[in-house]
């Protein structure tokens, strides 16, 4: 979830109660070699916030069981990580999570079927001192496997549908694969669902929710500093988002400085396709959505068509044409069918006095060309000299330590797709128009 996304109401609530195994008779902080975890036991964080063990999300019918991490003292929507999403256990009494002869953790049944593994050995990270290793569930919800003080594997590197405070989420892929959040299939089935959240493979400055392979929602393009904060009145604290490099990869993360709140705030990719920032309200014993996107139909990807934009500043959020444009089909537009978008009122006259109209507080369009190491004048000249350039946007950044560039020049060639006007946020978008309009 991006800090620049406005707060909206929720269209689809995802609430269910997890039927955790009522067999939990013992608990510890660590999983050790020779001491497997079986149904009836859990690993618990030191402060009691999180637990790891077997659970079933189904409250009726044929139950399937998973190894997961959940909030121990929250009764609903409490699972934040699942190991064996695609390989459930049908008989929990026959399955264990244990160290193998190498340095791996493996979930298997009595028939020897491997249902899930950390797969460290295959990655070449195996330790000859595996018997000295241990896996610990920490107070932040991270399950870490160490050997001789070295981290061999951690659950934070393999998110399912949830980001927790302090978790680094990788948005580049120089030496590692991009990380993604993948929704549950439905509220009672944690197998991989239809919706995926992650960075665009070719541009870490923006992130997408995809429905299958189709863009469903796009974040605003990053145009700011390495740390961005947003005060949330309902929790009386600031949620901050950071952009940072670790081992030559770029990561985003979020945090909450108030200790009493931070362990109960999360970012979730839900099964309806919404990215939510949620907090547990102990006063009413329910989750509260602090942010939820997309909220309106016109917040969905490309909903307003080419050269149209979603205006979030009006009491009724709807599509409009960019300045200097009008609907392609006015009858459809009146009937709130916007997919055909808009066309120019006046044709361009390249080299004969074309100008640029400034639209402020915009989520700039998709499908841009990112030109690096440009001054503002250079960026303007690049667009002006190219008759196919339909718009530009420019920002001074603090990302030089990340990509060697402290500016961001974006150019658009052709149609402008998936544009929005935001409430008190966004940036300037300069749209090329006939000089008579300016």
Task: For every predicted segment, state its role.
Residues 2-438:
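Beta-rich ligand-binding surfaces for carbohydrates and other polyanions
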């Amino acid at each position: 979830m991006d800090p620049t996304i406005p707060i909206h109401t929720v269209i689809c609530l995802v609430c269910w109660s997890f039927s955790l195994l009522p067999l939990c008779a013992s608990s510890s902080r660590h999983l050790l070699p020779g001491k497997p975890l079986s149904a009836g036991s859990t690993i618990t964080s030191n402060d009691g916030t999180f637990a790891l063990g077997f659970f079933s999300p189904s409250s009726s019918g044929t139950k399937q069981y998973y190894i997961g991490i959940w909030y121990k003292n929250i009764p609903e929507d409490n699972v934040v990580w699942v190991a064996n999403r695609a390989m459930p256990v049908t008989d929990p009494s026959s399955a264990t999570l244990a160290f193998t002869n190498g340095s791996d953790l493996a979930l298997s049944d009595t028939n020897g079927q491997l249902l899930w593994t950390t797969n460290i050995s295959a990655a070449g990270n195996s330790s000859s001192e595996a018997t000295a290793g241990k896996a610990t569930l920490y107070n932040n919800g991270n399950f870490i496997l160490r050997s001789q003080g070295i981290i061999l594997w951690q659950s934070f590197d393999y998110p399912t549908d949830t980001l927790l405070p302090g978790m680094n989420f990788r948005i580049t892929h120089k030496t590692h694969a991009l990380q993604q959040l993948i929704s549950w299939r439905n509220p009672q089935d944690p197998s991989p669902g239809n919706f995926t959240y992650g960075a665009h493979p070719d541009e870490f400055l923006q992130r997408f929710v995809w429905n299958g392979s189709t863009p469903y929602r796009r974040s605003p393009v990053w145009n700011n500093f390495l740390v961005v904060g947003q005060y949330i009145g309902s929790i009386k604290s600031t949620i901050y988002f950071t952009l940072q490099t670790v081992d030559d990869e770029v990561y985003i993360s979020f945090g909450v400085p108030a200790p009493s709140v931070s362990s109960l705030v999360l970012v979730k990719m839900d099964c309806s396709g919404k990215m939510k920032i949620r907090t547990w309200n102990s006063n009413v014993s329910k989750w509260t959505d602090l942010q939820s996107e997309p909220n309106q139909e016109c917040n969905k990807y490309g909903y307003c068509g080419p050269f149209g934009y979603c205006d979030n500043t009006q009491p009724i959020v709807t599509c409009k044409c960019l300045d200097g444009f009008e609907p392609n089909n006015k009858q459809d537009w009146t009937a709130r069918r916007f997919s055909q978008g808009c066309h120019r009122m006046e044709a361009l006259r390249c080299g004969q006095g074309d100008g640029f109209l400034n639209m402020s507080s915009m989520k700039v369009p998709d499908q841009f060309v990112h030109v690096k190491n440009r001054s503002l004048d250079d960026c303007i000249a690049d667009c002006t000299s190219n008759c196919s350039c339909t718009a530009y946007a420019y920002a001074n950044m603090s990302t030089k330590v990340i990509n060697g560039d402290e500016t961001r020049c974006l150019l658009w060639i052709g149609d402008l797709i998936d544009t929005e006007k935001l409430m008190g946020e966004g940036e300037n978008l300069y749209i090329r128009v006939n000089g008579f309009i300016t």
